[in-house]
Amino acid sequence: MKISIISFGSSPREWLGLYKKEINKIKQFKYQIEFINLSEHSQENIELKKMLETKDILQKIPKNSSCYLFTERGKTVTSKEFSQLLNFSNICFIIGGSYGVDEKLIAKSRPDIGFLSFGKLTFAHKIFKLIVLEQIYRGFSIKFNRKYHHAD
């Protein structure tokens, strides 16, 4: 069982220890974490850049994955609701590039992809990856009735 996280840019070395700590906590739930790091396009035209990067994302989505894109226009979910998304053996989370993604192209090419939001704040990719990992761990803790999550 695997969770893939597609994002742009590599992870800074000083953050790898934090990611590894979260990944090790998730492993107890029998899931592997795979980072798929893509390179941002240097295209100056923002709409073209988003389209090219979206095409790159679509090519990298693992087959037979339940897939979710993080976007500020996505559905805001509670930790409990997020835990219900973790009911598949292969899950893919997408973090778009610095200008986002071509959401129309995503919806047209893969209408099965869910759009999620963790609120209206904007985060650096390195921080958001850590937030996603923590929420995956929290979600599994809720799903398997572990004592990590204390809110209703």
UniProtKB/Swiss-Prot annotation:
Pfam families: SPOUT_MTase. Gene3D superfamilies: 3.40.1280.10. One of its GO terms (molecular function) is rRNA (pseudouridine-N3-)-methyltransferase activity. CDD domains: RlmH-like. Coiled coil: none annotated. S-adenosyl-L-methionine binds at L69, G96, F118, G119, K120, L121, T122, F123. It catalyses: pseudouridine(1915) in 23S rRNA + S-adenosyl-L-methionine = N(3)-methylpseudouridine(1915) in 23S rRNA + S-adenosyl-L-homocysteine + H(+). It is an enzyme of class 2 (transferase). The keyword Lyase does not apply. Its main location: cytoplasm. It is found in: Cytoplasm. Keywords: Cytoplasm, Methyltransferase, rRNA processing, S-adenosyl-L-methionine, Transferase. Its EC number is 2.1.1.177. The keyword rRNA processing applies. One of its GO terms (cellular component) is cytoplasm. InterPro entries: Alpha/beta_knot_MTases (IPR029028), RlmH-like (IPR003742), tRNA_m1G_MTases_N (IPR029026). Belongs to the RNA methyltransferase RlmH family. Specifically methylates the pseudouridine at position 1915 (m3Psi1915) in 23S rRNA. Homodimer. This is Ribosomal RNA large subunit methyltransferase H. The gene is rlmH.
